[in-house]
Amino acid sequence: MAIKERSLEETPTWAVAVVCFVLLFISIMIEYFLHFIGHWFKKKHKKALSEALEKVKAELMLLGFISLLLVVLQTPVSEICIPRNIAATWHPCSNHQEIAKYGKDYIDDGRKILEDFDSNDFYSPRRNLATKGYDKCAEKGKVALVSAYGIHQLHIFIFVLAVFHVLYCIITYALGKTKMKKWKSWERETKTIEYQYANDPERFRFARDTSFGRRHLNIWSKSTFTLWITCFFRQFFGSVTKVDYLTLRHGFIMAHLPAGSAARFDFQKYIERSLEQDFTVVVGISPLIWCIAVLFILTNTHGWDSYLWLPFLPLIVILIVGAKLQMIISKLGLRIQEKGDVVKGAPVVEPGDDLFWFGRPRFILFLIHLVLFTNAFQLAFFVWSTYEFTLKNCFHHKTEDIAIRITMGVLIQVLCSYITLPLYALVTQMGTSMRPTIFNDRVANALKKWHHTAKKQTKHGHSGSNTPHSSRPTTPTHGMSPVHLLHNYNNRSLDQQTSFTASPSPPRFSDYSGQGHGHQHFFDPESQNHSYQREITDSEFSNSHHPQVDMASPVREEKEIVEHVKVDLSEFTFKK
């Protein structure tokens, strides 16, 4: 007879209290740790990482719901009975393995007979666990759909999978940012006189003689097949080079920002903010990803030999993605040559969504997300099955299976962190539209407030200006425009204030972000010089000594920024 487990009526209260105290203590410590991390992100103005942390909390809450459902439904599910012939199909173990491990009675009856614990059976990880001490389905000549203990094991696996996925994404992101630190020195170099001289806009050169041309315009670039082969192997030897970074940076600035902003725009900071925003997507587990996890569980069936092909799927996908990203850079170089053999100044690449699969740069992010999850699934499944069923079990009973899973897990981690992720962070900026992260936090918040005010006034049907309704601009007036956040009003000298007051028209974007005298000034959304940022209220502007200000000028200002900064409105939202 099986030994029925004790209920809480037969358990000492001090034992229950100790267990509750330990669980509460661990839960509170985790809560405080997450709160501390969130506070640190806000202190460092890491808004995207703070959103990623919220995604992690949402995943933990989802795990809590799954745990609750598994606990509540454990008994009802274990009482669902199915015929024995159906239950005998799609097992992880072969019949020979099951007989050797559990005995012939297990195969004949289609179920595990609950027996008294045998000290000679200590190697078996299966517990003598039953919901109410016996199998109800056995009385009907059937087998339980999933036993109570099987549901408990599934519960543990789902938790391990989610934890591994989050940890895997964090490690990949951290290692990728470590690799990208060298880009800071490249960005600083663009501010030097030597760089300006080497990229003299009045200098004529052959496209093939430029550093970018010598790297990408070769004999193998004439054939698509040889170009794919070259790009495939190029990702292993300097996936992101200095010449590629500087050329793509120059092309991005020429395509999206005003002329003359190359020396002021921090492309590396923009990429960093964009990558942080993408991390909020990767760290989550979408319903589609959960469905893929269910399919992976289905492949662990005897005879499918999933250990021979499943670990290689993420490797193949990540290598194809890396080759595609290198292919995009090469195509940008070929487009330069198609326009002519001679270039003036630095080579200018032309970004476009047509370079990416299906015209969607975000599709590559989905593939990277899928690779990270698939690899995390492999390692999580290996750790869970080893914990539950010892190292050699039905899921990986061969030594080569164990070696393949571990080797592929480490290899894909290195490839994704040090090769594909930095390459993706750079090349994905070559789409038709730029990301909302082009603005720093100060400007982004100003735009949100401006949009909120404009939307509110449009809703109420009135404006703060005194112009007639028919001539009233559809955009907010100057006092509501974010232009007042892009310049300094406090620290300006008296001469600057005098010239500002004497101006016959309101200051434009090009007047706010200059540095020094005698230089061309321009609007710079990336400007980190906070001494040139000051908020002017409506009253300050209305009390200034230039009553001849044309109130329609904000419309021209808005058109100017739309012409220079082409943000995709479908991506740039103002949701709080």
Curated annotation (Swiss-Prot):
Q: Segment Calmodulin-binding: which positions?
A: 441-462
Question: What highest taxon heads this organism's lineage?
Answer: Eukaryota
List the Extracellular topological domains. 1-13, 81-155, 300-308, 384-405
Q: Which residues cross the membrane?
A: 14-34, 60-80, 156-176, 279-299, 309-329, 363-383, 406-426
Q: Which Pfam families match?
A: Mlo
Where's it mainly located?
membrane
> Which residues does the record list as Phosphoserine (modified residue)?
505
Under InterPro entries, the record lists: Mlo (IPR004326)
| Basic residues: compositionally biased ranges | 450-462
Which keywords does this chain's UniProt record carry? Calmodulin-binding, Membrane, Pathogenesis-related protein, Phosphoprotein, Plant defense, Transmembrane, Transmembrane helix
GO BP annotations listed: defense response; defense response to fungus; leaf senescence
GO cellular component terms listed in the entry, alphabetical order: plasma membrane
Its membrane topology: Multi-pass membrane protein
Q: Which GO terms describe its molecular function?
A: calmodulin binding
Location in the cell? Membrane
**Extent of Polar residues compositional bias:** 488-503
Region described as Disordered: spans on this chain: 450-557
Q: Which residues lie on this side of the membrane: Cytoplasmic?
A: 35-59, 177-278, 330-362, 427-576
Q: Which residue stretches does the UniProt record annotate as biased composition, category Low complexity?
A: 467-478
- Reproduce the free-text note on domains from the UniProt record: The C-terminus contains a calmodulin-binding domain, which binds calmodulin in a calcium-dependent fashion.
Q: What is known about what this protein does?
A: May be involved in modulation of pathogen defense and leaf cell death. Activity seems to be regulated by Ca(2+)-dependent calmodulin binding and seems not to require heterotrimeric G proteins.
Of which family is this protein a member? Belongs to the MLO family.
Q: What is this protein called?
A: MLO-like protein 12
Please report the organism this UniProt entry assigns to the protein: Arabidopsis thaliana (Mouse-ear cress)
Q: What is the lineage of its organism?
A: Eukaryota, Viridiplantae, Streptophyta, Embryophyta, Tracheophyta
